[in-house]
Amino acid sequence: MSTDSDHTHPIPPAFQEYDTQKLRQSPAFGHGKHGIADLVVGREDNKPTRLLSDFLRVPYHLSGTLDSDPVDELITVCLQDPTGAITQGDRHSLTVTARPDAYAHITNQSASKVQTMKASYAHLEATLIAESGAYLEYLPEPTILNEDARCLQTTTVEMAPDATVIVGDVFVPDGLSAHEPFSFDHYHSRTDARVEQRLICADAVNLQPAQRDPRNLATIGEYTVIGNLYVFSPGADVEAIAEMVHQRLTDHEGAAGVSTLRNEAGITVRALGDRSTDVTAAIEAAWDETRRELLGVGAPLGDR
């Protein structure tokens, strides 16, 4: 099974088939369509975390870093994309390495809007590496799929046993126009996490509405928007985090659930709703509660 880069998950067979379809405009991996962001953050002694190195290729852009987080040692990196949309043949690859004891929050400027496609697909890839004692958050804005869009979204986490990695995502179908719900072609999102090469989580959302309507009881039922939060923290009190998050989500508009990972490696949260604002609020509430348990301070929700 082929891959798009050295770090990515194997490309699913359906997306390999899409990749054989020729594009009339710039080909996949062409100029402006092969975005790369390779970031390394580090920290010395008790000083704040700094961005040690960065390599970016269009359409990724970075103006600088922020130190507005209530956690003094944590750095915030907000990636920008001047193109405003994801189109057929786009391949975007993000790699973040957090050196020992570094604290970082990675996000982006706005939602990833995946446009209508006639061939190929778009791949949004993230590889997160957290070394000993590191704390790394990756919470991008929602991914929005338009009519006939195809999107493969993969996240790989590699971490030390005493590190923490938090990953969040929200998926919104057909948010750019007045199309029928779930008129996109194919959406496949997968998150894998490993602690010293030991797999602790493998989770996927694979939706092909033309083959199977997602609005069934076994998938998402009556809802349309899907949100996920993954908290990988083998050294934490996982049961306590799960209980606090569960209580926080009791009044969520829609449906939400919390599960603990095997070997107490962390928790997963899934939220469903009819509006992106409701699902985003649920994921942010779970993130906020997790932070209070792990860092003793809540999330900077007003700054997002």
UniProtKB/Swiss-Prot annotation:
Disulfide partners: none
InterPro entries: UreD (IPR002669)
GO cellular component: cytoplasm
Protein's recorded name: Urease accessory protein UreD
Single GO molecular function: nickel cation binding
Similarity comment: family membership: Belongs to the UreD family.
Keyword check for Chaperone: yes
Record localization: Cytoplasm
UniProt keyword terms in alphabetical order: Chaperone, Cytoplasm, Nickel insertion
Signal peptide (residue range): none
Gene coding for it: ureD
Function: Required for maturation of urease via the functional incorporation of the urease nickel metallocenter.
Quaternary data: UreD, UreF and UreG form a complex that acts as a GTP-hydrolysis-dependent molecular chaperone, activating the urease apoprotein by helping to assemble the nickel containing metallocenter of UreC. The UreE protein probably delivers the nickel.
Superkingdom field: Archaea
